[in-house]
Amino acid sequence: MDMPKPNPTILARKSQLLDRLASFLPREALIHDPSETRAYECDGLTAYKCPPLAVVLPASTAEVSETLRICNDMGVPVVPRGAGTSLAGGALPTEDSVIIGVARMTEVLETDYDNRFIRVQTGRTNLSVTGAVEEDGFFYAPDPSSQLACAIAGNIAMNSGGAHCLKYGVTTNNLMGVTMVLMDGTVTEIGGAHLDAEGLDLLGLICGSEGQLGIVTEATLRILHKPEGARPVLIGYDSSEIAGQCVSDIIKAGVLPVAIEFMDRPCIRATEAFAGAGYPDCEALLIVEVEGSDAEIDEQLETIMDIARKHDPVELRQSSSEDESKRIWLGRKSAFGAMGKINDYMCLDGTIPVNELPYVLKRIGEMSKEYGLDVANVFHAGDGNMHPLILFDANKEGDLELCEELGAEILKLCVEVGGCLTGEHGVGIEKRDLMLHQYDPPDLEIQMAVKDVFDPKWLLNPAKVFPLASSDTRRIAAE
Amino acid sequence: MTLPGRCPGPRSIFGTMKALAPTSEAELAEMVASASEPLRIMGGGTRPIGVPVNGQPLTTSRLTGVTLYEPGALTLVVQAGTPVEEVRKTLAAEGQRLAFEPMDHRGLLGTTGEPTIGGVFAANVSGPRRIQAGAARDFLLGVRFVDGQGQVTRNGGRVMKNVTGYDLVKLMAGSYGTLGVLTELALKVLPASHHTATITLSGLDDTTAVAALSRALGSPFEITGAAHRQTADGPQTCLRIEGFEKSVAYRAGQIQTLLADLGAAKVETDPDTNTTLWQDIRDVACFHDGEGDIWRLSVKPSDAPGIKAQVDGAEALYDWGGGLVWLRVPQNTHADTIRAAVNAAGGHATLIRGNRAGGAFQPLSPPIAALQDGLRARFDPRGILNPGLMGRAA
C-alpha cells in the first residue's frame, strides 16, 4: 500500500508545532512520545501501520478549532479519528500527520423526547447513545456490529449502517445536524432539531466523506421509540439461489422486516462450532426479524413463513422465546469472531442488486477455488450488502497479497453486476485504488472538486478515498 | 412549426421564450456546454420556487422513460423528465410506491403542466410520510447529471447501501438545478400498505395538538402521518397508521388509548377517504384558494405553535408532527417578521407563494454560504445554471 512520502519540512518543524499546540492544550491532551503515539499507528485494518507525528485529544470544539487552525497554518496533515475501528484504514496516519481524536468528547448535550432527538459530542460510542435513552424506551437506530466501541464521529465519517438498516436506514438517514470544524478552524453549524437543513444538503455531503471535509464535534441524532417486541425466524435452504429467491419474494410481498441476514455453509459451520446457536448444517441460512406487538409479529411471520415454505426449506424455525431469539442472533453476531478463531480473514463489504445474489455467490465460489482460498459469506441480504470473508494464513508468505488480489476481484464483480465497492465500511486506503473501477475520471474529478472547496490545501485525512495518482497533482500543488 | 429540440412550454412559466428541450443526455450536455447565457433549468415547471431566474429555459421533460425496474430489489431507474404520474402507475402495478409521498405543487402555486420525477428530487419534495419513511433525498440511490460545463457525471448507483466515495447524490437532491441538470435517477421504492387508518381528534388548540402529535410519534406505534389543520368544522388533529389489517386495527386502538385524555377520537378506515385526506394535507389544499403569501417553515415541532403566534394574521397547517408549518399570511407581510421568529427558535423558512423579489430561501450563515458558493463555483464555473436561485447572486 503506497502512502505519500512524509514532508521533510514538517518533520523538521515538529518541535515548533508541538510548542504551538502545547501553548493552549492541557498536558494530557497532547501525545507525542513515540512509545505512546504507537497506540495510534493503525485502526481496525491492522495490516498497515504508521505512527503519527503527534496525537491531540481535545475536550471541546474550541480546542479542535485551534488545533486545526495551527495545523492549517503550518501545512500539517490532520487525520481525524473516532474510536479507530475502521476496517478500511480510514484513520491510518502518515508520518507527518497529527491525529485529532475525539475520544474525550463523550458528553450528552441535550435529550428531547418530545421532538425525538439527542445531541451528543461525537466521541460518544454508538451503543452509549442508545444507552442514554433506553431507560425511557428510546433508541438510536444505526447499529454497526462494532457499536460497542465505535464512535459517532466515525459513524458520520463513514455513513455507517448495520443489521437493522433495511427498516431504519443508515447514519445519513438518522443525522439531523452537526457542529463541524473546517480545516482552517472555522466552526460551522448545519441543521439541528428540525428536518431537512437549509440550503444545499451539506449534511448529506459530509456524512460518508471519511473525515476529509471537516471534523464533526457534535451531532444531533434522530431517536425513536423502541418497538414493543421483535422476533426472528430461522430459514434454511439447500441452495443459495433458492434462499435468494425467498428474500426477493419476502420483499415483494410487502412485508418489511427489520433485518434479513444470510449465512452460507462455511460460515454456519464455523459459527456453530464457536457459538452453538443450533443452526442447521445447510447451504444457506436466513435470519429474518420482524417487529411489533406479539400479534403483529405473528401476522408478519405467518406471511414470511408461508413464502418460505413455498421454496421447500430444510429448516423453518420460529423463535418462541426471548432466549431463543437471542441464541439465533448470537450465531450471526459472533460470525466474525468465530471466523477469527479458526483463521486470519479479510472482510469485504461490496453491495450488489439483491436479484444478482445467486450469480454473485456462484462466481465467488468459483473464484475461491481458482485462488485456493476459502471464502465464507455472511451478509445483509435484504439490501444486498455482502460481507465475504476470505480466509488466509498471515504467517504464510504471499498469502495476504493473494487474499487482497482475490478481494479486489470480488469487489470488481460487485461493480460489474451493478453494485458498488463498499456498502458501509468506507473506501479508506483499502479500496482507494479500486475507485476507477467504479467511477470514470470525471466522476472522481467532481468529488475531488468538493474537497477543494472544504479543504483547499488537501490536508485533511490524506491519501484516503481517491487513488493516489488521481489526487497527486492536488496534494503536490498544495505543498 | 416546432423546431427540433424545442417545445412551447406553459405560458406562465416559460414566458415567451421557447424552452430548450433536449431528447437525450448527450444533446442536453451539448446545449449546456455551448450555452452563452444563463439557463433556467426546469422539469415540468410546476414548482417555480425562489426568485424567478432570468435566463433561457431548458427543460428535461423530454428525457422520459423507465430504464430499469426490479420490484424484488425495490429499485427503479428512471429518466429525469418522466412524469411523476407515470412513475406512480408503474409502481402501483407491482403494489409499490414512492414512500416519501411527494407533494404536487400545482394547486398551491396555480401552475399547470406535468410534474416530473427529476423536479421532485431537484427540490427534495416530500410529503406527510417524511416523518417515518424519510425525505425524497433518502430514497435517491444514484444520479446522472450534466454539470455547468456540459460534463456528464454520475454518482451513487442502484443499490441500497453505498458509501463508495462522496455522496453527491444527497448534494444533488434539493439543489434546484444549481449544481447540474439531473438526467437519470435511481430510486429506492417501497411496498404500498394494505390498510390505512386515520385517528382524528377535534377541537384542540395548536399547542395541545402538537403535544398530542409528539406523544403519538414518541410511541412504538409507527405513525406515518401527523398533522393539525383548520376545517369548517373546527381544528382537526390527524394521525395516520398504515400496514397489515390486524396491525393497523391494533395500533389505532393503542393510539386512542394513549390520547384518551384529549376527548373522543374518530377513526377513519375507508381507503378513498384516507387518500383524499392525506393528499389534501400533502398538497396544502386548505390554502389553494384565496389571497395571501405562503411560507414553508421547517422547525423543531414544539416551537411551531409559538412561531405561528408571533406572526399577525397567520393561519397554519402543521404537518410532520408540527415540524413542517405551512403559513398563510396577509399579502406582502414583511419577510423579517417571519424570519425573526424562525431564527430565534432555529430552523428555516422559505417563501413559496407571494412576492419573492426580496429572496425566497433562508439566508445562510456566512461560513455555510461560503461553502455553498464554493460548491456552485466548482460545479458551474460560468455561473449559468439557475443563477440567483438559492441565494447566490446572479
Predicted features by range, described:
Chain A
Residues 1-479:
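Noncatalytic alpha-helical scaffold of FAD-dependent oxidoreductases
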